[in-house]
Amino acid sequence: MIIENNKKKALEKALDKIEKQFGKGSIMTLGENRSMDIETISTGSLSLDIALGTGGLPMGRIVEIYGPESSGKTTLTLEVIYEAQKKGKICAFIDAEHALDPIYAKNLGVDINNLLCSQPDNGEQALEICDSLTRSGAVDLIIVDSVAALTPKAEIDGEIGDLHLGLAARMMSQAMRKLAGNLKNANTLLIFINQIRVKIGTIFGSPEVTTGGNALKFYASVRLDIRKIGTIKDGDIIIGNETRVKVVKNKISAPFRQAEFQILYGNGINTEGELITLGVNHNIIEKSGSWYSYNKNKIGQGKNNACNFLKNNPNISKEISRKIREINLIK
């Protein structure tokens, strides 16, 4: 008993010393740390929000979205910006690829007049801008498109053909160490879009690797693998992609879940189509033959007509979405 009391006194003394030196709240029990209640931003896809387990992407963390070309990476991040702006959050887009289309962003609902945009000259400049925006405490969401385009200054200044082994990986590693703590303190969500490469000589396992070294993999709380799995046709004309997103890493909920949804060219994620599919799966919407019904009222014959009904009746769409979220314990 005496030993236990001595331990308790020694612990209290140590905690007091730490708090005097580093400030109140620098150390506490895990139960006292209210940051466990993680705020999230919707991805714009209800099925992906469900797969993430918390209703969206976590604030104050690093997220990596990667996949092949034209798989929907930028579209998904623009949908996240739209959802964040709906909540009144300030967003920034670091366009390292110099390829952001403002007209397309506007079509997806993004308020381009209130979206901060930077087209940096090199990788160090891009990451420094990210850090400055984060430390300001005023920006809630930052998108970097893409890691592969974050070219180190030494490589830009050098000749084509010069060897610059590991420069990008070292740059990313240093940036991650600096950014991780600042993002947490500012409660800023940082999303990196990344490309994939094929590793030559791989015999076992997947030959696909992401660019920029391993630091981003370790520091990311969520990693999403996005792939095109099919096309959507209107007659002979291709109007969109069938898309699958796999949650490869998830520090805030269970990983390895996946979501499937449609991305329509020029319009983004087909949210009404998702509501129909999820509504039928959860017995919220009834399907009899080709007819769809909600609350015993027919809403359309065929999925396209049912989608048009939901598009023209946003209150019913919100009601169905709320019921699906309640079933899946998403706020």
Curated annotation (Swiss-Prot):
The keyword Repeat does not apply. Keywords: ATP-binding, Cytoplasm, DNA damage, DNA recombination, DNA repair, DNA-binding, Nucleotide-binding, SOS response. SMART domains: AAA (SM00382). It holds the Pfam family RecA_C. GO terms for biological process: DNA recombination; DNA repair; SOS response. ATP binds at G67, P68, E69, S70, S71, G72, K73, T74. It is found in: Cytoplasm. InterPro entries: AAA+_ATPase, DNA_recomb/repair_RecA, DNA_recomb/repair_RecA_CS, P-loop_NTPase, RecA-like_C, RecA-like_N, RecA_ATP-bd, RecA_C_sf. The keyword Cell division does not apply. Its main location: cytoplasm. CDD domains: RecA (cd00983). One of its GO terms (molecular function) is single-stranded DNA binding. One of its GO terms (cellular component) is cytosol. SUPFAM superfamilies: P-loop containing nucleoside triphosphate hydrolases, RecA protein, C-terminal domain. Belongs to the RecA family. Can catalyze the hydrolysis of ATP in the presence of single-stranded DNA, the ATP-dependent uptake of single-stranded DNA by duplex DNA, and the ATP-dependent hybridization of homologous single-stranded DNAs. It interacts with LexA causing its activation and leading to its autocatalytic cleavage. This is Protein RecA. It comes from Wigglesworthia glossinidia brevipalpis. The lineage of its organism: Bacteria, Pseudomonadati, Pseudomonadota, Gammaproteobacteria, Enterobacterales.
